């Protein structure tokens, strides 16, 4: 829940319009630059979401989801602690904002599937 609140804080402090950000990336995916290993690690962790959902559904094991959500939140914390999101320039800023936004949405969706309420701020 803390990671979701942190993402909301980034978006609010940065005055980010999520719809414009998503549209920009959809229209021009080349703006994403995964140049840092922490960016790549977070992106790869996010890409596992579909497989995690399939595992949970196949085996009826919600603990798979809770474990993966913990891993995602930990991965995001490492990313956030080491890399500036709002102070980054150009494509780096866009990439980091997109990764942050997607992390927040994915954590929220995973927790809601488990019946966990997710606050926007702590």
PLM regions with names:
Residues 1-122:
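Non-catalytic interaction-recognition regions
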